[in-house]
Regions:
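C-terminal transmembrane helix and the adjacent membrane-cytosol boundary/short C-terminal tail
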Residues: 163, 174, 227-228, 269-305
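Glycine-rich helix-loop "coupling/hinge" segments at transmembrane-helix boundaries
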Residues: 157-159, 187, 236-275, 279
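Periplasmic/extracellular loop-to-transmembrane helix junction in inner-membrane transport proteins
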Residues: 27-35, 63-111, 259-277
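Transmembrane alpha-helical segments of polytopic membrane transport and secretion proteins
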Residues: 1-45, 289-305
Length: 305
């Protein structure tokens, strides 16, 4: 039939205009390689391998991470100890996977706390009146002006944080200020929308409006900050442990492994510093790469509206 015939180039130009070539390419089903184009595939693959190794650390590790092999102190990388041993005789290869598990848990838990506090606080400030909004934002700016590391050090000393949960909570409650400002800005743009006003008029509670109408409309805008918070939490834990103010020595993390750096420099045992540092840097770079990809996708989405 005539309706089923294929349009010529001239007829297609009349239908969709000068962009007929783009229209024709969009109609064609994309191949697997085209779907992966522009995506941080290598970063996602590396991060997947690291996370997989940390999750199944008991399978990947070939030595007891808490074992002290006193006959092999500061042994360089070799057949028995793939990544060598530290000054306490512990197998670095096994410590990497068990320590990565702790660091990733702190990163995810701290990010969850940052997200919950930042989103809730930003929604309250964005929907509140001018006076309440001004007070809430001044408080955020005041807290944000204090160096984050200083706040964490003060809270760690006061609360005597020395376990994974408490360290994650402290990092979380001191890192939500930037996210709250972004959420507040997004909420103020949509708070007078018809669907939000209708939900309020129908008696919808603040929690209902926030969960069903506010968050779905700005979640894409905060994904970069949320993903970047994972690397920030891991970095902060490593910094605290490196300074001797984080997790105790018996709790293995990448940061606590790097806390032996001063001894390693004196004794010229480079593998004690380099190997945990490489895993930490690769993980942070992969997370940052994924966050940058999400931000570029969001920017492209808004620029095409």
């Amino acid at each position: 039939m005539v309706a089923d015939r294929k349009l010529s180039e001239a007829e297609l130009f009349q239908v969709v205009g000068a962009g007929w070539k783009q229209h024709e390419s969009e109609k064609r089903k994309k191949t697997f390689q085209e779907k992966l184009k522009g995506k941080p595939v290598f970063s996602m693959f590396l991060l997947f391998l690291i996370v997989l190794g940390c999750v199944f650390a008991n399978v990947v590790a070939n030595h007891d991470p808490s074992g002290f092999y006193l006959q092999n102190l500061n042994t360089p990388p070799g057949k028995e100890f793939i990544f060598g041993t530290d000054s306490l005789g512990r197998d670095i290869y096994s410590l990497i996977w068990y320590g990565g598990r702790v660091s990733l848990v702190i990163g995810l838990l701290g990010t969850a706390i940052i997200t919950v506090i930042g989103v809730t606080y930003g929604c309250i400030s964005g929907t509140a009146g001018p006076k309440v909004d001004s007070v809430l934002m001044r408080f955020t700016e005041m807290c944000g002006s204090i160096p984050t590391l200083l706040l964490i050090l003060i809270l760690s000393a006061v609360l005597q944080a020395d376990d994974v949960i408490s360290i994650s909570v402290i990092i979380g409650i001191t890192g939500w200020f930037a996210l709250a400002r972004i959420v507040r800005s997004e909420v103020r743009q949509i708070r007078n929308s018809d669907y939000v006003m209708y939900a309020r008029l129908c008696g919808g509670s603040f929690g209902y409006v926030m969960y069903h109408h506010l968050i779905p409309n700005f979640v894409s805008a905060i994904m970069f900050v949320v993903i970047s918070s994972i690397s920030s939490c891991i970095t902060m834990e490593s910094t605290l442990s490196f300074l001797g103010l984080g997790l105790p020595a018996d709790v293995i993390s990448w940061g606590s492994m790097l806390s032996l750096a001063n001894k390693a420099l004196i004794m010229n045992t480079w593998w004690v510093i380099v190997i945990p540092g490489v895993f930490l840097v690769i993980t942070l770079m992969c997370i940052t790469s994924m966050g940058s990809f999400v931000r570029s996708e969001v920017n492209n989405h808004y620029s095409n509206l």
